[in-house]
Amino acid sequence: MFRGSIPAVITPFSENKVDYDSLTKVLTHLIDNGSHGLVPCGTTGESPTLSHDEHKKIIEETIRVTDKRIPVIAGTGSNNTLEAIEYTEHAENSGADAALIVTPYYNKPVSYTHLTLPTTPYV
């Protein structure tokens, strides 16, 4: 489904806030230089340190800037299963092509039942 160079996108900050103008420049640079897809909000993009609003806006901005020219694989993983589901549903509803969901780190679910929580077919 995916092939080629699909970099994890850094999240630029300025004065302790996400710098969305610089994010647009980074995304444009990656697209203009031949990336075959983009992965915003992975751990390289500082996802564990982002607020929920920042996380969602970065996904939305990436989808807007790519404008369907290349796939967007949204980083939606979290230690919190319900948060991962929320991020994944948001990514799907915003137009992401796929989601990158990491296995919970630092703590683990006590059983497989967390996998039976309501999700969309997108997960």
Predicted features by range, described:
Residues 114-123:
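Single conserved hydrophobic/aromatic residue that forms the stacking wall/gate
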Residues 3-14, 41:
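Generic N-terminal amphipathic, Lys/Arg-enriched alpha-helix
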Residues 14, 20-115:
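Active-site beta->alpha loop and helix N-cap motifs at the rims of alpha/beta catalytic domains
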Residues 1-2, 68:
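Residue-level preference for short coil/turn positions at secondary-structure junctions
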Residues 2-3, 20:
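Onset of an N-terminal alpha helix
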